[in-house]
């Protein structure tokens, strides 16, 4: 078998120290992702991986592994198992005075809050997990967050964006969010469109807290960065919708120049596919609609309607990012089903974002040196880490990450997809232009 250690490192190691772990204007190093420490990933196969059991460091992966949202389970099994395999190949994670192998235990939410509660409780009480990790849907995350607090278990949320998760009503000390929130996304996208001519926007989002928060965040961003913009329509649809025609007909009649949508899989791809079929080829400002099969289905040039904003992109040019992309791409060539198609060959958006966040989490836990949640909390609060595409800072008072956001318009042709549009040059929006606000009712942030 080939060794992947040298694939990315020959070019990148020298550059790592130039990018690396020193903040601008400072000689003080901060912890950083180091590509030279990544294990040989040539034997990694997410379709076949089996984790050790027994005296392990246990992560409860909370995600939909069945039901209409099951694609998300496949996504995040891939990413968490990547991180765990890497660390296990290095000898495990150093905690409590010894190295422990990492075990990923699936917790199927079925995208249902009641099932989520039972599953999270089982993971805490029976499996004795050290960390709960997930999940798609802020309404699902809220349930996990409450269980984590009850059983004093660290909860890592690398994917769900509702600001309400970290407000005075719902915040708890055990929960940490390592991804952008809806306000950060809305501000970054509005900042980007302030430099484009379009002024008429139609908001089309999923009908639950996250979708409404996405709409509010974007409208606040427009008011701040593009005050002459007009929201010509606003619709919210049920999760896992099959027929978007009634909503897209409203968009057609609204005079909109851009569709703004925070929809995640399967709704986002379904919506865009049906919009194209109806002849509605407006720019789609989005977060999660970068699906490779969708881009191939709608055709290369058509995919250039996609404008994506996110906190990770494969097209961000840093030594760390280049290294992990090359290692991932080489490893993917030998993966088995369901990961044996070209959908998985690059660590796009949610893949790169979540492995970046989990490398940070492991780094924090090793620096804490223990599985004691109180010491992990103390280490993570206020922590700074140089990740794959830039600095991550955990705001101490509300456990919300502060980070730059990236925006790109999809291009065809491109490096990432031979048959469809994909990521173009990433425009970095500095965190000062998309700073997550602190909830007014979170008293601990007023001290």
Question: What are these model-predicted stretches?
Answer:
Residues 29-53, 57, 384-447:
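Solvent-exposed, acidic/polar segments of extracytosolic/periplasmic ligand-binding ectodomains
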Residues 38-83, 107-113, 136-139, 204-212, ...:
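Extracytoplasmic "Venus flytrap"
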Residues 40-47, 71-78, 90-166, 178, ...:
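Beta-alpha junction/loop-to-helix N-cap segments that form part of ligand/metal-binding clefts
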Residues 44-45, 114, 129-234, 283-315:
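Extracytoplasmic ligand/sensor domains, especially the bilobed periplasmic-binding protein
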Residues 123-136, 156-158, 202-205, 255-265, ...:
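Periplasmic-binding protein-like
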Residues 272-355, 366-369, 414, 420-446:
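Extracellular/periplasmic periplasmic-binding protein-like sensory domains
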Residues 366-378:
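Short, charged, surface-exposed loops that flank catalytic or proteolytic processing sites
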């Amino acid at each position: 078998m080939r060794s992947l250690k040298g694939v990315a490192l020959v070019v990148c190691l020298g550059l790592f120290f130039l990018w690396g772990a020193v903040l601008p204007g400072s000689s003080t190093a901060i912890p950083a992702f180091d590509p030279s420490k990544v294990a040989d990933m040539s034997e990694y196969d997410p379709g076949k991986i089996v984790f050790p059991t027994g005296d392990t460091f246990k992560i409860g992966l909370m995600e939909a592994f069945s039901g209409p949202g099951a694609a998300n389970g496949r996504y995040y099994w891939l990413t968490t198992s990547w991180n765990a395999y890497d660390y296990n190949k290095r000898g495990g994670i150093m905690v409590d005075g010894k190295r422990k192998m990492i075990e990923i235990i699936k917790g199927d939410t079925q995208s249902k809050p009641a099932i989520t509660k039972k599953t999270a409780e089982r993971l805490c009480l029976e499996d004795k997990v050290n960390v709960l990790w997930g999940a798609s849907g802020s309404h699902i995350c809220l349930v996990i967050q409450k269980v984590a607090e009850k059983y004093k278990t660290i909860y890592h949320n690398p994917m769900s964006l509702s600001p309400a998760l970290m407000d005075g009503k719902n915040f708890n000390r055990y929960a940490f969010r390592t991804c952008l929130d809806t306000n950060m996304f809305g501000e970054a996208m509005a900042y980007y469109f302030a430099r484009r001519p379009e002024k008429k926007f139609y908001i089309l989002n999923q009908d639950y807290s996250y979708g409404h928060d996405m709409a509010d965040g974007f409208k606040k961003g427009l008011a701040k960065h593009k005050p002459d913009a007009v929201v010509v329509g606003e619709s919210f649809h049920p999760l896992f919708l099959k027929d978007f025609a009634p909503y897209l007909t409203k968009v057609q009649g609204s005079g909109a120049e851009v569709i703004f949508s925070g929809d995640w899989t399967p709704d986002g791809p379904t919506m865009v596919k049906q919009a194209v079929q109806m002849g509605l080829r407006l720019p789609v400002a989005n977060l999660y609609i970068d699906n490779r099969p969708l881009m191939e289905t709608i055709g290369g040039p058509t995919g250039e309607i996609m404008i994506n904003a996110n906190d990770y992109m494969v097209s961000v040019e840093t030594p760390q990012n280049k290294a992990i992309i090359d290692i991932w791409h080489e490893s993917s060539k030998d993966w088995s089903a369901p990961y044996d198609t070209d959908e998985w060959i690059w660590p796009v958006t949610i893949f790169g974002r979540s492995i970046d966040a989990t490398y940070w989490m492991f780094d924090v836990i090793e620096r804490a040196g223990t599985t004691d949640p109180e010491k992990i909390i103390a280490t993570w609060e206020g922590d700074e880490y140089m990740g794959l595409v830039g600095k991550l800072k955990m705001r101490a008072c509300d456990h919300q990450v502060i980070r730059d956001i990236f925006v790109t318009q999809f291009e065809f042709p491109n490096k990432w997809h031979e048959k469809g549009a994909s990521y173009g040059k990433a425009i970095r929006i500095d965190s000062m232009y998309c700073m997550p606000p602190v909830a007014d009712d979170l008293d601990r942030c007023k001290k």
